[in-house]
Amino acid sequence: MTVTGRLELVALDARDIDKLASFYAELAGWEIKRKESDWITVRTGDGQEIGFQLAPDHVAPRWPGQEHPQQFHLDLLVDGYEAAAERAIGLGATRLADGPTWVTLADPAGHPFDLCQKDGVGPVMGLFAATIDAPDASALARFYANLLGMEVTYEGPEGALIAGDGKSVMFQQVSGYNPPRWPDPAHPQQAHLDIIVDDLDAGEGRALELGASRLNAGGERFRVFADPAGHPFCLTL
């Protein structure tokens, strides 16, 4: 039987996780579910979760360049993205760019995120996807689709999308891609995925078979790996 994991959440690094979690909770209408000194979890309206991990030496990304790359960003769905963007700015965001039906901003920790128009969303924003930068978006999409038991639902020149169990992850094709080299502070991670498995040994075997690398970190209930694009991720019980 093929071993697959279950996507638990995407976690963003920040120096001030209280400020960042409160920003997203207030902007999107989401709920803070777990709060510890080094970790906060926020739950979206449809039950997805986003983590905020304390990183005292966090270096903010500087989008759109690759000297301090974004690595990850969140795509949020809202009915009335222009009004939502003004509200985000009032809460501490910075406007970065405008698209035909979306606006790109940086949150208070510097992580870019997109507010995307979707009619009829209601007062609580939706989380469409966490989007991960890659030098080969299709290859990274297939890696995670196989690891998570999800389906590749789109592939194109700009990126790829996988979906399953009510969750989606996008992969953005990036020219001149500069990978994280965690735990090297000169090339820090900006975010990571937490993936639940039933058995750490079996999960590790599957991840390595698909092209991941084991990193020298972890504990009794989790292990840390790098995906083929260098992004760290955790397998957890």
Language model segments and positions:
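Core segments of cupin and vicinal oxygen chelate
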Residues: 2-56, 83-84, 90-98, 103-104, ...
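Short hydrophobic/aromatic beta-strand micro-patches
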Residues: 13, 75-77, 131-133, 194-196
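Solvent-exposed, charged amphipathic helical/linker segments at domain boundaries
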Residues: 117-132
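Residue-level recognition of short loop/turn positions
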Residues: 46, 107-109, 227-229
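A short, acidic/glycine-rich surface segment
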Residues: 58-63, 176-182
